């Protein structure tokens, strides 16, 4: 399957769970035939319970609902939580679940990291927001800053087709000779255009990265990238510096208060290279950044699940929406500019690691280790990921007057 640019879409930017969850729950309530939902994380908290209620009501009124969760990201849902949904007819699957070893989750590579919802053939959501209370602004200092899009229009059919073709037993045959795809060209740029792109470990291994590279090559005035886990390969780093050196304003927003310390260490390894090359780097300080968005000039934008790190670019299953629309671009720009002004600290010369031989050696070693990490993982014993469907709970046998206990063949009193 290969998607093209679709015209005539209605695309809405959603910021954080405050906007995303009400929109998803409303769409589920309006569903008439089909709901497909896949996510990396679903927690059994306030948000998860609201999603549970929405799906249960939809299934009870006859809507076919399918849920796919990642076996690493969502390992701890209770039997009661899942069983109530499967009893109502919801098809509930885990992507590549694995048993724990000494209480630890071991299935950390090649995860299903997409966040997609499709309602009938009318509405779709694509983004980076999971289903947990930590995506709500009232969660506290650790509330995540993130984005998604709600879309109606022709591109929804592409997203639905992708979901249907990737259901169990429907995966297309592997075609190793078609692994490398050029970024789809928008030959007739206009408004309200959208392109659905994804990353897998078969034919579409670097599709999302190619669109970033193409965007940086074509940029004329401005690029803003906000990415939670930023540690891309040399090609993308070089493209950012090259754009900045030809006069493009290139701004990068990364985590200043990361949820994982190694994220900050990894990003700071690149500060010298980027800042010396003219890239403006900003650390988001208000709370953890979880977004994966970018824009270029006054028309191009992307929102999705893909980070710019080795896991997302080389191992995980990801999905983004590429958008060509001036109104959407301006909406996203206003949001990111507000973040830069109000919640970021620009990285200046005083914040750069000192250029010592020891720091240079550490940076080179760490950089090459992280960049070659996917290849190292490839040496581990490989297996084919599988989807595990959760069956409905067994119904208890009904007691009747005519039932005879097999342990007691005598007559009941």
From Swiss-Prot:
What's the name of its gene?
Answer: clsB
Q: What is the E.C. number?
A: 2.7.8.-
Question: Which GO biological process annotations does it have?
Answer: cardiolipin biosynthetic process
Q: Main subcellular localization, coarse class?
A: membrane
Using the UniProt annotation, give all residue ranges assigned to the region (Disordered). 388-413
- UniProt KW Acyltransferase keyword: no
Protein purpose? Catalyzes the phosphatidyl group transfer from one phosphatidylglycerol molecule to another to form cardiolipin (CL) (diphosphatidylglycerol) and glycerol.
Q: What is the name of the protein in this document?
A: Cardiolipin synthase B
